[in-house]
Amino acid sequence: MKFKLFLLVFFVFLLPYLSQSCENTFSCPTLNQTCTGQCSAGLVCNQTLSSCQEYEKCDSSLPLAEDTCSQDGYICVSNVCLPFIGTQYPSSQCKQNSNCLMSLCAGNICMVMPGSQCQTNSQCSPDQFCSTTFIGTTSTSPSTMTLPMTMTLPMTMTLPITMTMGSSSVCTNRLQLNSQCSTSDSCQTGLACINSVCSPIFSGAENATCFPGAIEPTKAACDVGLSCLNGANGYSCKSYVENQSCDPSDEYPVCNSDYQSCKCNSKGKGSCQSYYKLTQECKDSSNKLVLCAKSKNSIPSYKDYVTQINCQSQLCNYSRDCIDPKAKVSTCFNDLFLMCPSDYQEPEIGSSSSSSSSSSSSGSSSNSTSSSTSSTSSTSSESSESSNGSNSNSVSSESSSPSSSSVESSSNSKSNHTSSESSSSDDDLGNPSSSSILSVSKLIILLISIILYCF
């Protein structure tokens, strides 16, 4: 009888625990399906209806104040209305105060608040960062904090000490090349703080000191094959292991690279997966995107619509060369669909991630919800086009390619797209079928356990 009880406990509790694997049943919702953030390319997650709906069409050629977007907080970009609520950087386009991070829209441009006060870098213009200065004063006059100090050596005295602490955060100009730095945020676009000096991105050699948190290749301090890792002497550029094992169920899964996160792989195991292809091609494309963005006073990021408008060619090359195939699945192809509609095409069903990704890479984002929500749009191009001559005109003509026809054609084919996304999702981000098999096997084990217990 005891042996039967042991078998029952083993099969019902221990064996399923030992055989369990991580699960990832991610798929891209289609039209009218429930959504929480992402939808299939060509659709937007309507927060009011909590379902995937088609983008509202509009005319990007119209002045911002005259666009036809019916919902508050929406702006016309690439001929569709996108939700830009409280996400716009200073100098970016806006229609009302709620469009701007600093809640100040004047003349259809997001403005910096008086005094240039800030809380984050995104509240400053692209050539500035939010610098915080801590202020401390001491006096004998009454104030906010009084510390009575008593010392017996052998005499006793009581000394009132008044301490007043505060901080001031203001937008400060970023540091130029070869300037002394203490954080990478303080360096100009295209530079990173390496060995305490503002240096070009991707220039950090092995063991060079660096600062972590470079979430995009356009901010990478370390050269190809290296990542900013913590060691005995602090953070420095070190080689890192691709696809190391990890446990997605951990509260803080450990991956030894800023560009990696712990995800389920096709075998139901946890592995550190990167959203970027940190290769020499990516390094070259990142530098070209940075140069273009700097010339247009925009931010070199695939989530920034200033970049999409001003540097579409460089942005799409960056997307193809730097974004890993896995990212296109987790973002439902929306970044590529909106940023590079001329490059967007339906993935082939059953194709491997390596063969289909070269023509349809997309943006990441592991901690992003909807790419459009965190995107930004700017009119800085209008002031810079006159100084950039024909190059500006050519880029401007490229940015007009996101026509409503491309939006409609991609929307019409979203059903085929979704089935292929599910297939890609199985291969790249986890195997839902394996989790289903696991559930069935657990049920069979439970039945066997009951039979053994009865007989």
UniProtKB/Swiss-Prot annotation:
What GO biological process term is on the record, naming one? cell differentiation
Q: Where is the signal peptide?
A: 1-21
Q: Where is this region: Disordered?
A: 349-434
- Membrane topology designation: Lipid-anchor; GPI-anchor
Identify the main location.
membrane
Keywords on record: Cell membrane, Differentiation, Glycoprotein, GPI-anchor, Lipoprotein, Membrane, Signal
List, alphabetically, the GO terms of the cellular component aspect. Answer: plasma membrane; side of membrane
What residue ranges constitute the propeptide?
434-455
Which cysteines bridge via disulfide bonds?
none
- Where found? Cell membrane
In this UniProt entry, which residues carry a covalently attached lipid of the kind GPI-like-anchor amidated serine? 433
Segments of skewed composition (Low complexity): 351-423
Further remark, if any?
Overexpression rather impaired the progression of differentiation. Antisense RNA-mediated dia1 inactivation was found to enhance the initial step of cell differentiation.
Q: What does this protein do?
A: Plays a role in differentiation.
The identity of this protein, by name, is Differentiation-associated protein 1
Which organism encodes this protein?
Answer: Dictyostelium discoideum (Social amoeba)
